[in-house]
């Protein structure tokens, strides 16, 4: 049974736009009786199970089709990382006949080289349930960024062009540099090759990972570059994509961290949409409106990195909408 919970009618209606490091303020919601067709829908289910992952995907009404369906996940840096559990996602990946897709990292670690990256994916159980494609194993290619300020193009794994349909299956959590990571980060940094990751992190200054840390821009330029890379991917795939966020193990740290901080707040659930901006916005709203103080660390991480700026900028350049109808599935 589906029941409409609420519609977010403005970008500020639910999430307080606190200054960096600021505290969350009281928020309000506006109830509606029926969803508005022009506003994207975000589907939500609280219990995080393999059956419910399938259920929330089916609610989207868009079937993953084609000979090559890519399921974009993060394979996780180490066994301590909070990457998505294979028991949770196995049935869903089989349902869509998907192949896990990833790209190498731009920093030293277990996933900076293809051979070690495959080994890490194997250790984390992913190769046992579906093929894994490290998309920049054979190099990279570019896709255009329309209307960008920092990037004229995005640098993605060469194999990305082989896929007919994109399933963006993200673990929503905090992030050391972006404040939070969800669908937008997964399609920007996540689909970028190692060189592409350097390109985004430096706001177009260098594609050489060896030069990344010496060329970091001011924070908003990095955040905006992530949004621009996400736009390139969204424009490329068009309507052949779905976006799902699993909001569990809500650490302040990303799955790219080999020794992440333990989660403080409780799991939120599974959310899905055809709009990645609306999806990430709904997840952020749930964090800011969580009913107890266990949310504080994650909110401080988001605010201290000006993390919500990616939502504002992504909406501005046409990636998606921060307005959404939230529908719960029971």
Feature roles, as predicted:
Residues 26-33:
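N-terminal, intrinsically disordered, polar/charged segments of Gram-positive cell-envelope systems
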Residues 21-23:
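Bacterial signal peptide processing site
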Residues 11-12:
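Repetitive helical segments and hydrophobic/amphipathic motifs
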Residues 16-19:
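C-terminal motif of bacterial Sec signal peptides marking the signal peptidase cleavage site
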Residues 34-330:
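Extended, low-polarity segments enriched in aliphatic/aromatic residues
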Residues 1-8:
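Bacterial N-terminal signal peptides that target proteins for export
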